[in-house]
């Protein structure tokens, strides 16, 4: 009440003095502006920006692997953990698009050990950190890459024409390229070994299943995932929402699209993988060729086909 009285007295004084030349109208206007914010703070709060976080969903998805029905099928020493700028437990490689489903990960050698005690933000892992830079892991892959360089084919033909037939040029080139591959792999040596991963920054997790157990694992996993409900197209969307997970889930999971999809999530590329289900904001994908499962944070997905 005292504040209200002060405002009334102030305004009365201003009205009384408005005919005098010394009246400070700007001061009065500034007072009114300040009055809105300081005396009525609840009416002029800045809108809160919703932050998209996959931590809870990724934790719930990983917790499924603790169940007795799923744990025996999982190789906990063949994991990869993908964030925006680094990968633990794998390198990036090229994809053979002729034989989907495929991914752009090498063999997995990271370890998922356990959930950190008394900490909801971290999981205990073991593995090496690498930059998400594709490396050729086969001689054929490197040869194909070098063969696309202009002038290389002509140079090889010229060398082949001048060397004696007793010299096996192919064997020499293979040895040179093999040495180059070894150098590239050595250059991609991990930056460091790590023991913990932040669930707040994980974009995707990949892990291997024993090939003979893949179908059994898929069947058991489906029991624990969210039930699928088809939805009709609804054009009344909340386009102001800064999170995209709802629209992506509607497209990947809630619609009658083909179950085989291609997904790009940061540095992870998956072609022709199967949509197995979801756990809240984590989409679960399967790769039957490599007996590999992917937990992908929906908000990290950039492109879909």
UniProtKB/Swiss-Prot annotation:
Q: Give all cystine bridges in this chain.
A: none
Record's keyword terms, sorted? Sporulation
Q: Effect of gene disruption?
A: Inactivation of the gene produces changes in the ultrastructure of the spore. In thick-exosporium spores, the absence of the gene leads to thickening of the coat. Inactivation of the gene leads to a significant decrease of the spores with a polar appendage. According to Permpoonpattana et al., disruption mutant exhibits a major structural defect in spore assembly, with a clear misassembly of the outermost layers of the spore coat. However, Pizarro-Guajardo et al. demonstrated that mutant forms spores with a similar overall ultrastructure to the parental wild-type strain.
Biological role stated in the UniProt entry: Contributes to maintain proper thickness of the spore coat. May contribute to the formation of polar appendages. May play an important role in assembly of the outer layers of the spore coat.
Q: Which organism is it from?
A: Clostridioides difficile (strain 630)
Question: For this UniProt entry, what is the primary localization, expressed as one broad class?
Answer: other
Its GO biological process terms?
sporulation resulting in formation of a cellular spore
Which InterPro entries does this one have? Spore_exo_CotA-like
Q: Which gene encodes it?
A: cotA
Q: What is this protein called?
A: Spore coat protein CotA
* Cell compartments where the protein resides: Spore coat; Spore, Perispore
